């Protein structure tokens, strides 16, 4: 495949992903041999497409390719933990987490990764709560504040749940997780007058202002030279990848050996 054809494929893929047409994007992804691509951003997008289609082994293989090409690997390790948890491969998730912690010892998102592993393992609620409480001491974000309140509810810690909901509503005022917190609180007691007013106007905020991902996790996945965002760091290769048949499937093994690396 020449460079023009590859660029056409890449533009089509970008367009489909932007429209969130991940089923259509999958057909494009499977028509290209990505082993010869150096761009971490592009490989990250390919992994996104596989992940959106619940093709976790393929997503993991692409992420391992990206990790092999990365000088830092922090953001890719974060995603490898997430994908391994979705595959219920907790041994590998823990291995990737340990690698992440080694290069991001002071990054608060390590608490989120560890929590996701515990949640996937269905660990006791007390352990999950303890970890999110540690995270909350360092970062107070809507999504995980609500998650903690919900865990309190599941654990039968009603007053802690109510207090956590009140705190979230007070600090963030509006948005998806504020509405969820108000719904959760109303299972146990009525909203305060000011909260009731917020609840009645809950659809007034603009949906496009709602973050699609927790800011701390997003920072790790997409940031630049700080170590979290290798996905946007490199240029496309001068030599373009080969197209493979759409029905040809993907390799069954993960990246291994020099023969699968870009020279």
Regions found by a protein language model. Give the residues of each.
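Start-of-helix register in tetratricopeptide repeats
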Residues: 7, 40-41, 74-75, 109, ...
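"A position-specific structural signal for the A-helix of alpha-solenoid helical repeats
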Residues: 11, 45, 79, 113, ...
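Residue-level signature for tetratricopeptide repeat
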Residues: 11-15, 49, 83, 117-119, ...
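Structural motif corresponding to the intra-repeat A-B loop/turn of tetratricopeptide repeats
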Residues: 19, 53, 87, 121-122, ...
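Single-residue signature of alpha-solenoid repeat helices
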Residues: 25, 59, 93, 127-128, ...
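Alpha-helical adaptor scaffolds
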Residues: 44-51, 64-68, 72-140
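TPR/TPR-like (Sel1-like) alpha-helical repeat modules
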Residues: 69, 102-104, 157-177, 182-208
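Intrinsically disordered, low-complexity acidic segments enriched in Asp/Glu and Pro
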Residues: 196-263
């Amino acid at each position: 495949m020449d460079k023009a054809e590859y660029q056409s494929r890449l533009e089509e893929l970008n367009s489909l992903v932007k429209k969130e047409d991940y089923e259509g994007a999958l057909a494009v992804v499977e028509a290209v041999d990505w082993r010869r691509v150096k761009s971490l951003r592009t490989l990250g997008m390919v992994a996104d497409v596989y992940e959106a289609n619940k093709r976790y082994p393929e997503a993991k293989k692409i992420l391992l390719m990206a990790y092999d090409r990365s000088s830092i690997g922090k953001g890719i390790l974060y995603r490898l933990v997430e994908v391994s948890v979705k595959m219920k491969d907790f041994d590998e998730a823990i291995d990737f987490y340990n690698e992440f912690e080694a290069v991001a010892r002071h990054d608060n998102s390590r608490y989120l990764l560890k929590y996701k592993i515990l949640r996937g393992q269905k660990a006791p609620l007390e352990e999950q709560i303890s970890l999110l409480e540690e995270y909350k001491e360092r970062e107070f974000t809507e999504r995980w504040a609500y998650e903690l309140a919900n865990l309190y509810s599941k654990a039968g810690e009603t007053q802690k749940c109510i207090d956590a909901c009140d705190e979230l509503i007070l600090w963030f005022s509006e948005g998806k997780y504020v509405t969820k917190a108000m719904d959760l609180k109303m299972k146990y007691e009525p909203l305060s007058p000011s909260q009731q007013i917020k609840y009645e106007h809950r659809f007034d905020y603009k949906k496009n202002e709602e973050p699609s991902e927790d800011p701390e996790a997003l920072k790790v996945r997409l940031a630049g030279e700080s170590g979290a965002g290798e996905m946007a760091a490199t240029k496309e290769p001068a030599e373009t990848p080969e197209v493979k048949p759409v029905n040809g499937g993907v390799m069954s093994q993960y990246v291994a050996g020099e023969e699968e690396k870009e020279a």
